[in-house]
Amino acid sequence: MKSIAIIGASGYTGAQITSLINADCNFSVQGLYVSENSLDKGRKLADLYPTYSHMAYTLSPLSDDAKKKIVAEADAVVLATEHSVSLELAAWFYQQGLAVFDLSGAYRFADVAQYPKWYGFEHTHPDVLAQAVYGLAEWNSEQIKQTRMIAVPGCYPTASLTALKPLKPFLTEMYPVINAVSGVTGAGRKAQLHTSFCEVSLTPYGVLGHRHQPEIATHLGQEVIFTPHLGNFKRGILATITVQLKPGTTEADVAKAYSVYDNAPIVTVKHNQFPKVDDVVNTPNCHLGWKYDANSGYLVVASAIDNLMKGAASQGLQCIKIHFGV
């Protein structure tokens, strides 16, 4: 049984992956940690999330002694921390010999030049970055097995890339257009005016400047137009994507392209049927639905996931299981 430490466990994704690991007979939770200045240190996870009342874990401060204890006892560490925090912690734990599964964006770009623009910091660990694998589980499983540094994808990129990557050989030079709506949990647990009950409303944000746009483009290998929206629901993502396919592409070609997921139990693909968020909430699943107009060459594909599950925690667990071969 592999032992997993979870850092940043007081947030939505940290608590979610704690629940998933706790329920998996292949793994044990070494401990839950928050920063030393966190107001949540010393509290029980169930005090923050009564839905997890069956788990008796306490949130410990990540002191130097705690880090040494993790290295001595754990096989892997999950980082559900801010990007700049993960930057340093991931490198330190990797250098101590642990497998690192980072839910932040600190290791998703291979190009160090991307980080100042999109994350506001210089990447100070290019040696560790060079070992990082992008943890899109259905596409990079062999690489995930071979490295100890896994950058778990963002929620919007997971929904978008799962829909688009099978179509890559058929895409024209026209940019795919991605319109995606996420539940409020995508903004995190900290109180903010725009996510409060009386203020939240369906609205676009990060227009032509969201950091997930270059993440999608980098791992698709093609530029995209990406517009995220805040939805007035708790969790889930629906991405509706319009693409132009090369002349001569047939419906049969598209169906064959999506057959790449025939042996991927988490991904369900339907032709001329479209998914809804409610069908994937609280599951690790991705539901895809597509329709193609061969006359115009345009295809619309919709992708639905739970932003806290396939968009973060359950994909993190997928990567852990792939890496350890369980």
From Swiss-Prot:
Keyword Amino-acid biosynthesis included in the entry's annotation: yes
Catalytic residues in the record: 155
Keyword tags: Amino-acid biosynthesis, Arginine biosynthesis, Cytoplasm, NADP, Oxidoreductase
Gene Ontology biological-process annotations: L-arginine biosynthetic process
Annotated metabolic or biological route of this protein: Amino-acid biosynthesis; L-arginine biosynthesis; N(2)-acetyl-L-ornithine from L-glutamate: step 3/4
Domain of life of the organism encoding this protein: Bacteria
One matching Pfam family: Semialdhyde_dhC_1
Record's GO cellular component terms: cytoplasm
Disulfide linkage: none
Catalysed transformations (reactions): N-acetyl-L-glutamate 5-semialdehyde + phosphate + NADP(+) = N-acetyl-L-glutamyl 5-phosphate + NADPH + H(+)
Compartments (UniProt record): Cytoplasm
SUPFAM superfamilies in alphabetical order: Glyceraldehyde-3-phosphate dehydrogenase-like, C-terminal domain, NAD(P)-binding Rossmann-fold domains
Main subcellular location: cytoplasm
Molecular-function annotations in GO: N-acetyl-gamma-glutamyl-phosphate reductase activity; NAD binding; NADP+ binding
CDD domains named in the record: AGPR_1_C (cd23934), AGPR_1_N (cd17895)
Enzyme Commission number: 1.2.1.38
Recorded family membership: Belongs to the NAGSA dehydrogenase family. Type 1 subfamily.
Biological role stated in the UniProt entry: Catalyzes the NADPH-dependent reduction of N-acetyl-5-glutamyl phosphate to yield N-acetyl-L-glutamate 5-semialdehyde.
NCBIfam families per UniProt: argC (TIGR01850)
Protein name: N-acetyl-gamma-glutamyl-phosphate reductase
Gene that encodes the chain: argC
